[in-house]
Amino acid sequence: MSGHSKWATIKRKKAATDQKRGNLFTKLVKEITIAAKMGGGDPSGNPRLRLAIDTARANSMPMDNIQRAIKKGTGELEGATYEEITYEGYGPGGIAIIIETATDNRNRTVADIRHLMSRSGGSLGENGSVGWMFNRKGSIEVPKSAISEDDLMELLLDAGLEELESDDEQYYTVLTDVKDLEPVKKALEEAEIPFENAKMDMIPDNYVELDVEDARKALKLIDALENSDDAQAVYSNMDISESVMSALEEE
């Protein structure tokens, strides 16, 4: 199984138990607000806002909450002013970690991130220290039960498919150039093919395989980072083998 597909599988398992809905809604509201502030409140002309709204709706956020977040972004309602800051560093086993945040207090945020990294044996680095190891891509998961691999590839090639990973037992992972995420989503929608987790992702060039001890520490660190108040997304280049995952699940 490729590192990206394996990590996607791990994240799905984690999401079922780790993500508190209130915390998730807070992150989604921030993303909608920032997207509306940067590109306007009309999702038809603002792909980032449209993606944020789609994600919020997929997670059962009420439309009232979505509309309020948009209006805070456009200035129609008062709200906090968020600044987007990306932090980079190293975690257990030497894995590279990128933390994307949205904050109204950068001093608080960097202190929180540094504390979480250092207590787990990691370290916060300078901007660019690990970012060069990753590429930003569009990412979509398509259930294997919905379509064959050949048919999916044929459907999406002209829309902007860059890579199709099929190692996961339940999902294909569709990777696109950033600019092609929306056309690929549209192609799936028009063909009435279900999909999940359409998002911008950071895909590492190479992966670092962890042993049981480092994997345990790394998963704990990423959980803590993902659940910190200001983190919007966390990416890493860690790879965890099936045997290590099985050992962790038995603990």
From Swiss-Prot:
Any one Gene Ontology cellular component term annotated for this protein: cytosol
Keyword Nuclease: no
Protein location: Cytoplasm
UniProt entry keywords in alphabetical sequence: Cytoplasm, DNA-binding, Transcription, Transcription regulation
GO molecular function, one term: DNA binding
Pfam families reported for this sequence: TACO1_YebC_N, Transcrip_reg
GO BP, one annotated term: regulation of DNA-templated transcription
InterPro entries, alphabetized: Integrase-like_N, TACO1_YebC-like_2nd/3rd_dom, TACO1_YebC_N, Transcrip_reg_TACO1-like, Transcrip_reg_TACO1-like_dom3, YebC-like
Statement: the UniProt record of this protein carries the keyword DNA-binding: yes
Chief place where the protein resides: cytoplasm
Transmembrane segments: none
SUPFAM superfamilies assigned to the protein according to its UniProt record, in alphabetical order: YebC-like
Family the UniProt entry places it in: Belongs to the TACO1 family.
Name of protein: Probable transcriptional regulatory protein Cpar_0525
Species the sequence originates in: Chlorobaculum parvum (strain DSM 263 / NCIMB 8327)
